[in-house]
Amino acid sequence: MFYYVYVLKSVNYNRLYIGFAVDLNKRIKEHNCGLSFSTKPYLPWQIIFFEAYKNERDAKRREKYLKTSQGGRLLKRMLKEYFYNNKSNSHCLA
């Protein structure tokens, strides 16, 4: 069994959401069905990043860290580098 830390991006708003889940697909569906108070106003959501952990405690610790200001800066830097690198390599897919 894996435990997941994930990042959702609102399709219509400039918002990110960081969460924890045991069943990642089910949890994303719950977000997009409006079943989460925190994400309901910013529907729909798409997953842009996730990490899998074998240990629940490690996953929850990572989620908590990414929600701090320091963790948020790290996450934004990682995402920026990832999307920049994939954008600059998109010509390789043609």
Describe the function of each predicted region.
Residues 1-43, 47-50, 58-68, 72, ...:
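GIY-YIG nuclease catalytic motif and its immediate N-terminal context
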